[in-house]
Amino acid sequence: MDSIKSNALYLRLPYIKNNYKEIIKEAEMNELSISEFLTDLLQNEADTRFKNGVSTKLRLAKFPHKLYLEDYKLDNYDAGQRKLIKEIMTLDFINNKENIILFGNPGVGKTHLAVGLGIKTCLENKNVLFISVPNLMIEIKEQMTLNQLHRFKKRFEKYDLVILDEMGYISFDKDVSEVLF
């Protein structure tokens, strides 16, 4: 039995490593065929890996709050705006490599919608970064000073969705705005 645990560890199969004894008992109790046993075992491992991947993506996205699309209120919008927001919620804009800009008065829910879109994107196993524009500008300036701007820009290629928040609250430095836009 120890060889199962050590091999699962070596092969990076955390579900099997942590649960193999119970899985074997359950398979014996239910008289599963080898095929059924392996199918269940590998499906559980895949599910665990997917869940762990999503958890990592959510953590690395750096969302300021957990805000979900299911909790987003569409009551304050007219029919045309509701239709557009529902279309955005499909995330088709990501697959189409389109940009969207959410703008409006403070307190209308732009950040809630943006974070909700980001969380939904993570749940689809895609990479997201949430960053405020003031913090991004600070990072850009630092990278310009260190002559690391090319590497910094390259980092953004791994993201399926980059959410820039608080764009309207700052004045733009000329050099930084050329990089940003």
Regions found by a protein language model. Give the residues of each.
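Loop/turn-to-beta-strand initiation segments
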Residues: 98, 125-127, 158-161
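Conserved nucleotide-sensing/catalytic segment adjacent to the nucleotide-binding pocket
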Residues: 148-181
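Conserved adenine-nucleotide phosphate-binding loops and their immediately adjacent elements
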Residues: 61-73
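Interdomain "pre-motor" coupling segment immediately N-terminal to P-loop NTPase/helicase cores
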Residues: 5-64
